Amino acid sequence: MKSQWSNFHQIGRNSFLAASTVYVSNEFNFLNTSLLNRRSFCFAEGDRSSFVVLKSEAEFNSALSKARDGSLPSVFYFTAAWCGPCRLISPVILELSNKYPDVTTYKVDIDEGGLSNAIGKLNVSAVPTLQFFKGGVKKAEIVGVDVVRLKSVMEQLYK
């Protein structure tokens, strides 16, 4: 069967569109078990991850205080339920939170009630946005989906 994306070669290989475009077949293969081997978004028992979902401004302020006083290396992941790119990068962030268990990753849903002031405190204007803190200082920021840069920043700052 020929792909319906005949002009796909005109899109840059490293562009977001190329990375997020998925060919959909007219047939479904029930024998395809690749999804069975994928990691669940739920944390398994014994998971070493340090992934925290912030639900209130008080929780956000506490996390930001820990990040700014230097006591806790942190990543703030600003996201939204409606954000397609956020859904693409979420599994990578979960994987990295397991790889670097001493770094706390805080997930902040920008549409969560009471967190609108949090967005202003760190000057977040788009999602996904990741801000990296080490030694009490914001060391890096990534806006958008850049998996290679995300892995590189994590390795440089927290290894």
Curated annotation (Swiss-Prot):
Keywords: Disulfide bond, Electron transport, Mitochondrion, Phosphoprotein, Redox-active center, Transit peptide, Transport. Disulfide bonds join C83-C86. It comes from the Eukaryota. It is found in: Mitochondrion. Coiled coil: none annotated. SUPFAM superfamilies: Thioredoxin-like. Transmembrane segments: none annotated. The active site is at C83 (nucleophile), C86 (nucleophile). The record marks G84, P85 as: Contributes to redox potential value. InterPro entries: Thioredoxin-like_sf (IPR036249), Thioredoxin_domain (IPR013766). The keyword Iron does not apply. Thiol-disulfide oxidoreductase that may participate in various redox reactions. Possesses insulin disulfide bonds reducing activity. Reduced by thioredoxin reductases NTRA and NTRB. Belongs to the thioredoxin family. Plant O-type subfamily. This is Thioredoxin O2, mitochondrial.
